[in-house]
């Protein structure tokens, strides 16, 4: 009975890492205790790049300052050593803890060494027993084979552990490189792509955290697996280096434990399955931005010129125009304009300006030669905004119908005995994924072109008039139509 108690006490004061009696024991918050040298070495080996520490047994995290010396356990170890070295205890080594007789037999059914009284007891009655000398060599060979197998598995486990760490480092480098590439691309469009860049980086951060989190967990699993194998190997080595009794004591259980050991491989993540960054047609955006930046070099200082009588009211700084109905006497015939011209007049060179049309449901802008008599009263009719009448313009009607106004197309209507010819104004529908709040107008007088840019959508081209015939000076043109919200000329700084 006393021997059994000593065994229990010895188990309580044995270090789970080195499997020897505790030396300078330190206790954690979770209640587990280890040798000072063992827990220090374990921390350095298992978490070389992290400040966080965890218990090797239960994995509970703990701060380093919470490691405290356990004098109570140290005293128990010293007393236990004294008892184990005493002559009385030495005489009991190799004796049955229950009967006090020598352990000379081995029970194959139970896999334990027993004494002759145990053999005759009800517990072992009918069991096949042999002398320990007869079975020692057999089990020594088995344990030797098991030891070699475990050593090989340990090597494989350590390689898998190293592979996980290498993969983790590779992922960090790959993610970091992806960040660098993404940021380099967005740098060219910083002002107009901040929102897209932020979204992509957030997705990438989430992917990195998710993958690395699982890889860290996989690494921890591999560390535990390796440590478990080390414990088994240490047990096998202890048995093989100890006495015959130590070799055979509980040997079947040890072998069964070893046979059930399976090497768990870490989870990996294939590059082919990861989300690859795809910029939203970045090349086209870069090209559009480049073209917009190029024409913005020719920014012209344009002001608005009042025209009377007119429904268009101009601000004091001559940079904004809005629609306002003017009351006049019905008996007096007056032609009212809906648009105004810009200044200066243009006879050569390249010129660019931008107009803010935010929230307007109707507007027309571009260039014109000058107001013509036949374009005054019926200026709201589309056929009046044709290049042949001196207008190169685009516009918005009814909130979302964008159009460019081209010269009329002639067609013939053949009837019985007669033929008539009519002109149909060509209104070109303009389709845009993002409606413009700000429109850029670029006139190249010598090239005879007028281009319109959607500044709101990264400067994509809205429409371009080619082969224009400028036989007279031309002017910037602005018409707020019947929408009371203003049209505003923008400054380069805005």
UniProtKB/Swiss-Prot annotation:
Residues 131-223 form a coiled coil. A zinc finger (B box-type) spans 91-132. The keyword Repressor does not apply. A zinc finger (RING-type) spans 15-59. GO terms for biological process: activation of innate immune response; autophagy; defense response to virus; innate immune response; positive regulation of canonical NF-kappaB signal transduction; positive regulation of MAPK cascade; positive regulation of NF-kappaB transcription factor activity; protein K63-linked ubiquitination. One of its GO terms (molecular function) is pattern recognition receptor activity. The modification Phosphoserine is found at residue 86. It holds the Pfam family zf-RING_UBOX. It is found in: Cytoplasm; Nucleus. Residues 280-494 form the B30.2/SPRY domain. Keywords: Acetylation, Antiviral defense, Autophagy, Coiled coil, Cytoplasm, Immunity, Innate immunity, Metal-binding, Nucleus, Phosphoprotein, Transferase, Ubl conjugation, Ubl conjugation pathway, Zinc, Zinc-finger. Residues 186-199 are annotated as: Required for interaction with GABARAP and for autophagy. Zn(2+) binds at residues 96, 99, 118, 124. The keyword Glycoprotein does not apply. InterPro entries: B30.2/SPRY (IPR001870), B30.2/SPRY_sf (IPR043136), Butyrophylin_SPRY (IPR003879), ConA-like_dom_sf (IPR013320), SPRY_dom (IPR003877), TRIM/RBCC (IPR050143), Znf-RING_euk (IPR027370), Znf_B-box (IPR000315). One of its GO terms (cellular component) is nucleus. It catalyses: S-ubiquitinyl-[E2 ubiquitin-conjugating enzyme]-L-cysteine + [acceptor protein]-L-lysine = [E2 ubiquitin-conjugating enzyme]-L-cysteine + N(6)-ubiquitinyl-[acceptor protein]-L-lysine. Capsid-specific restriction factor that prevents infection from non-host-adapted retroviruses. Blocks viral replication early in the life cycle, after viral entry but before reverse transcription. In addition to acting as a capsid-specific restriction factor, also acts as a pattern recognition receptor that activates innate immune signaling in response to the retroviral capsid lattice. Belongs to the TRIM/RBCC family. The B box-type zinc finger domain and the coiled-coil domain contribute to the higher and low order multimerization respectively which is essential for restriction activity. The coiled coil domain is important for higher order multimerization by promoting the initial dimerization. The B30.2/SPRY domain acts as a capsid recognition domain. Polymorphisms in this domain explain the observed species-specific differences among orthologs. This is Tripartite motif-containing protein 5. It comes from Saguinus labiatus (Red-chested mustached tamarin).
């Amino acid at each position: 009975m006393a021997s059994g108690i000593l065994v229990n006490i010895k188990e309580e004061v044995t270090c789970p890492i080195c499997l020897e009696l505790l030396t300078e024991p330190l206790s954690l918050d979770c209640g587990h205790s280890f040798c000072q040298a063992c827990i220090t070495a374990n921390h350095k080996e298992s978490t070389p790049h992290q400040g966080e520490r965890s218990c090797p047994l239960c994995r509970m995290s703990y701060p380093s300052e919470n490691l405290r010396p356990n004098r109570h356990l140290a005293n128990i170890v010293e007393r236990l050593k004294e008892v184990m070295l005493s002559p009385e205890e030495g005489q009991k080594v190799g004796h049955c803890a229950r009967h006090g007789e020598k352990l000379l037999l081995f029970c194959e059914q139970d896999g334990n060494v027993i004494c002759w009284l145990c053999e005759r007891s009800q517990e072992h009655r009918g069991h096949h027993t042999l002398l320990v000398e007869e079975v020692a060599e057999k089990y020594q060979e088995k344990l030797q084979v098991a030891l070699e197998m475990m050593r090989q598995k340990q090597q494989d486990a350590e390689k898998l552990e190293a592979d996980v760490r290498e993969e983790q480092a590779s992922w960090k480098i790959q993610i970091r490189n992806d960040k660098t590439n993404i940021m380099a691309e967005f740098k060219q469009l910083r002002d107009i792509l901040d929102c897209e860049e932020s979204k992509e980086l957030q997705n990438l951060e989430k992917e990195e955290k998710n993958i690395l989190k699982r890889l860290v967990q996989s690494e921890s699993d591999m560390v535990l697996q390796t440590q478990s194998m080390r414990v088994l190997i240490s047990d096998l080595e202890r048995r093989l280096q100890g006495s015959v009794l130590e070799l055979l004591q509980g040997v079947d259980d040890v072998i069964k434990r070893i046979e059930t050991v399976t090497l768990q491989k870490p989870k990996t993540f294939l590059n082919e399955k990861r989300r690859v960054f795809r910029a939203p047609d970045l090349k086209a955006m870069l090209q559009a931005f480049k073209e917009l930046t190029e024409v913005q070099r020719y920014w012209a200082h344009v002001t608005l010129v009042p025209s009377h009588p007119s429904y268009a009211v101009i601000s004091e700084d001559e940079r904004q125009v809005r629609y306002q109905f003017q009351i006049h006497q019905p008996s007096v015939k007056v032609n009212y304009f809906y648009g105004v011209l810009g200044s200066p007049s243009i006879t050569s060179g390249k010129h660019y300006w931008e107009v803010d049309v935010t929230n307007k449901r109707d507007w027309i802008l571009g260039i014109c030669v000058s107001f013509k008599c036949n374009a005054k009263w019926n200026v709201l009719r589309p056929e009046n905004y044709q290049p042949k009448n001196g207008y190169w313009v685009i516009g918005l009607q009814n909130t979302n119908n964008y159009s460019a106004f081209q010269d009329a197309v002639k067609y013939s209507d053949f009837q019985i005995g007669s033929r008539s010819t009519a002109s149909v104004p060509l209104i070109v529908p303009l389709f845009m994924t993002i409606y413009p709040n700000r429109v850029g107008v670029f006139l190249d007088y010598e090239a005879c072109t007028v281009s319109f840019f959607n500044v709101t959508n990264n400067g994509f081209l809205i429409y371009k008039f080619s082969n224009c015939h400028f036989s007279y000076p031309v002017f910037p043109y602005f018409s707020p139509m019947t929408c009371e919200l203003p049209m505003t000329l923008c400054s380069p700084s805005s």
